[in-house]
Swiss-Prot record:
Keywords: Ligase, Nucleotide-binding, Tricarboxylic acid cycle. Coiled coil: none annotated. InterPro entries: Cit_synth/succinyl-CoA_lig_AS, Citrt_syn/SCS-alpha_CS, CoA-bd, CoA_lig_alpha, NAD(P)-bd_dom_sf, SUCC_ACL_C, Succinyl-CoA_synth-like. Succinyl-CoA synthetase functions in the citric acid cycle (TCA), coupling the hydrolysis of succinyl-CoA to the synthesis of either ATP or GTP and thus represents the only step of substrate-level phosphorylation in the TCA. The alpha subunit of the enzyme binds the substrates coenzyme A and phosphate, while succinate binding and nucleotide specificity is provided by the beta subunit. The lineage of its organism: Bacteria, Bacillati, Bacillota, Bacilli, Bacillales. This is Succinate--CoA ligase [ADP-forming] subunit alpha. It is an enzyme of class 6 (ligase). Pfam families: CoA_binding, Ligase_CoA. CoA binds at residues 17-20, 43, 96-98. The gene is sucD. The active site is at 247 (tele-phosphohistidine intermediate). Pathway: Carbohydrate metabolism; tricarboxylic acid cycle; succinate from succinyl-CoA (ligase route): step 1/1. Gene3D superfamilies: NAD(P)-binding Rossmann-like Domain (3.40.50.720), Succinyl-CoA synthetase domains (3.40.50.261). GO terms for molecular function: nucleotide binding; succinate-CoA ligase (ADP-forming) activity; succinate-CoA ligase (GDP-forming) activity. SMART domains: CoA_binding.
Length: 302
């Protein structure tokens, strides 16, 4: 089991003929992801990396049965691409694109209400179910199958956490990058809920950062609902107020969204936190030992 995607997921790439999309399409195919279609308006009929290109999402879905799309479309046009995927009733859209205007995302979020399409991102590394399906830009080789779910606002910190776990012999079920923008499609609680219901996931690593209140809300949800150990890390502990730290959503404003507030709330709700990125793996190991599941998590033969 896994969450959101698995080896049977059929993927289309929106914006497939762009250089970034082409590079990552090849990487995803090499990983074993079933990429069945690409979409670039006006380029229908072409074949790139062995993948047929269509003019519209609707056409690509009808011809290939694709149920998930990944968006590598430039920021000015990305919101329209997400809406087109939702109109075609895809199960999920994973948007990698950064710098989409906030007002565009507000419109997209409103448009998706009441529809079945789940949006992950934007400005995210994607979603990967280890050894089965990689959709996005993450390095595939560090992910190994196991029992730890990872959810994160940061791409590179996800890779750091996963690499540490793999080095310790601890595999993962699915890693979900929810993205660093202030308005996104899937939040921490959505992913935690999925991990909580997934029989294969035995523990969770949650990586947040300064800005907003998503981590505090997730902490409260964990306290009330989660029946598996969760450990956390919050990026931006030395960030000054009012300065954006990399991501559009990573900003302390109005005295809210500080790392210390988030860490305190997580700790109060029973979530152990790592002080530095390099301690994420050992923090999970400590929590797993306390919960008596450490041996179960050792799925990688060294």
């Amino acid at each position: 089991m896994s969450v959101f995607i698995d080896k049977n997921t059929k993927v289309m790439v929106q914006g497939i003929t762009g250089s970034t999309a082409l590079f990552h399409t090849k990487q995803m195919l090499d990983y074993g992801t079933q990429i069945v279609a690409g979409v670039t308006p006006g380029k229908g009929g072409q074949v790139v990396e062995g993948v047929p290109v269509y003019n519209t999402v609707e056409e690509a879905k009808n011809e290939t049965g694709a149920n998930v799309s990944v968006v590598y479309v430039p920021a000015p046009f990305a919101a329209d691409s997400i809406i087109e995927a939702a109109d075609a009733d895809l199960d999920m859209v994973i948007c990698i694109t950064e710098h989409i205007p906030v007002v565009d995302m507000v419109k997209v979020k409103r448009y998706l209400q009441g529809r079945k399409t789940r949006l992950v991102g934007p400005n995210c590394p994607g979603v990967i179910t280890a050894d089965e399906c990689k959709i996005g830009i993450m390095p595939g080789y560090i992910h190994k199958k196991g029992h730890v779910g990872v959810v994160s606002r940061s791409g590179t910190l996800t890779y750091e956490a996963v690499h540490q776990l793999t080095e310790e012999g601890i595999g993962q079920t699915t890693a979900v990058g929810i993205g660093g923008d202030p308005v996104n499609g899937t939040n921490f609680i959505d992913v935690l809920k999925a991990f909580n219901e997934d029989s294969e996931t035995k523990a969770v690593v949650m990586i947040g950062e300064i800005g907003g209140t998503a981590e505090e809300e997730a902490a409260q949800w964990i306290k009330e609902n989660m029946n598996k150990p969760v450990v956390g890390f919050i990026g931006g502990q030395t960030a000054p107020p009012g300065k954006r730290m990399g991501h559009a959503g990573a900003i302390i404003s109005g005295g809210k969204g500080t790392a210390s507030e988030k860490i305190k709330t997580l700790n109060d709700c029973g979530v152990e936190t790592a002080d530095t990125p390099s301690e994420i793996g050992t923090t999970l190991i400590d929590a797993a030992k306390k919960a008596g599941i450490y041996e179960e998590l050792l799925t990688i033969k060294k």
